[in-house]
From Swiss-Prot:
Positions of transmembrane segments: none
Predominant subcellular localization, coarse grouping: cytoplasm
Matching InterPro entries: ADOMET_SYNTHASE_CS (IPR022631), S-AdoMet_synt_C (IPR022630), S-AdoMet_synt_central (IPR022629), S-AdoMet_synt_N (IPR022628), S-AdoMet_synthetase (IPR002133), S-AdoMet_synthetase_sfam (IPR022636)
Subcellular location(s) of the protein: Cytoplasm
Record's protein name: S-adenosylmethionine synthase 1
Cofactor section: Mn(2+); Mg(2+); Co(2+); K(+)
Residue sites binding ATP per the record: H15, D167, G168, K169, S235, G236, R237, F238, D246, R252, K253, A269, K273, K277
Length: 391
């Protein structure tokens, strides 16, 4: 049997890049909650004892940026310099301006345009992907890596493994076979977990606890065998972490946010962007399209691309490929997608309810992946049943 290995990684909410994604999206949530028409392009960077937020925000909302930064860092677990950042005593720098009026008139007509006339906030191309290898219709490598990361955070916060600290990374290698273009996972080949820890714990205890409390509850037993390789904190020491260990920046984990290296990526990040930014809204609608194709039984695997020009509502192109797994020709699937999904940015915002912020709606997306999550706030995960036209 011809098989191959494929690997995906994830990082925890305490990873400095992910900390920045969460701060940017917490600010987006705060703006949209008070003013659904907020225009937000918010970047965050961090290093030892410092978090800076900067970018362009036009909103009627009254937002305390410093409080949001500190609350987000504290919620992750950065409560002292020992763990990598002290949320209450670190420096918080804010450099936020209004959106350029040139962009505003071209995209929104200064709020005079109807939703269907609102132009894309920028040029770009985005991809959506779906595969029938998991119930989430997501790649197994990505699902396992992100769930391991989420479980690490869970056992840290609930006290099961008190030696854990917020920063951490996971990586999963799966052996697959290609079944006529569809991906069939056979077994987990390698599991890698590197987690920040305190000074008190031994490497033996780390390995034992990770196997018992993190790996065993997450990876289905049918995928593990006596050949599975485990690398558990292979560097031997990971006490210094978070922004103390590495600098962090919004938008540096775009593959973790999406499909773990499967499918394709147009390069645009999600966090800190309101829905007029097609980097985000375009990627969400093509995920819904690809997922709906697979969930409707029209293909076992599907990728959809959409592209935009700044200020233009209609997409420049829509592309679909089912990797030869389609039950009907790809051109017919493309016609169904165009008929059932409105790719104009103003209509994506309405149909996926993307102007609704607050209650951690977008902050939740900023750790452990934007897709394949079972949460009503992830409106783009809702399947539309697609039925081929009868000849």
């Amino acid at each position: 049997m011809d098989t191959f290995l494929f690997t995906s990684e994830s990082v925890n909410e305490g990873h400095p890049d992910k900390l920045c994604d969460q701060v940017s999206d917490a600010i987006l949530d705060a703006c949209l909650e008070q003013d659904p028409e907020s225009k937000v392009a918010c970047e965050t960077c961090t290093k030892t004892n410092m978090v800076m937020v900067f970018g362009e925000i036009t909103t009627k909302a009254k937002v305390n940026y410093e409080k949001i930064v500190r609350d987000t860092c504290r919620g992750i677990g950065f409560v002292s310099a020992d763990v990598g950042l002290d949320a209450d005593n670190c420096k918080v720098l804010v450099n936020i301006e209004q959106q350029s009026p040139d962009i505003a008139q071209g995209v929104h007509g200064h709020l005079t345009k109807k939703p269907e006339e609102i132009g894309a906030g920028d040029q770009g191309h985005m991809f959506g992907y779906a595969t029938d290898e998991t119930p989430e219709l997501m790649p197994l490598t990505h699902v396992l890596a992100t769930k391991l990361g989420a479980k690490l955070t869970e056992v840290r916060k609930n006290g099961t493994c008190p030696w854990l600290r917020p920063d951490g990374k996971t990586q999963v290698t799966v052996e697959y076979r290609n079944e006529g273009g569809a991906m069939v996972p056979i077994r987990v080949h390698t599991v890698l977990v590197s987690t920040q820890h305190d000074e008190t714990v031994t490497n033996e205890q780390i390995a034992k606890d990770l196997k018992e409390h993190v790996i065993k509850p997450v990876i289905p037993p049918q995928y593990l065998d006596d050949q599975t390789i485990f690398h558990l904190n292979p560097s031997g020491r990971f006490v210094i972490g978070g922004p103390h260990g590495d600098a962090g920046l919004t938008g540096r984990k775009i593959i973790i946010d999406t499909y773990g290296g499967w499918g394709a990526h147009g390069g645009g990040a999600f966090s800190g962007k309101d829905p007029t930014k097609v980097d985000r809204s375009g990627a969400y609608i093509v995920r819904q399209a690809a997922k709906s194709v697979v969930a409707s039984g029209l293909a076992r695997r599907c990728i959809v691309q959409v592209s935009y020009a700044i200020g233009v509502p209609e997409p420049l192109s829509v592309f679909v490929d089912t990797y030869k797994t389609g039950k009907i020709p790809d051109k017919d699937i493309l016609a169904l997608i165009k008929k059932n999904f409105d790719f104009r940015p103003g209509m994506i915002s309405i149909n996926l309810d993307l102007k609704r912020g607050g209650n951690f709606r977008f902050q939740k997306t900023a750790a452990y992946g934007h897709f394949g999550r079972d949460d009503p706030d992830f409106s783009w995960e809702t399947v539309k049943q697609l039925k081929p036209e009868k000849a």
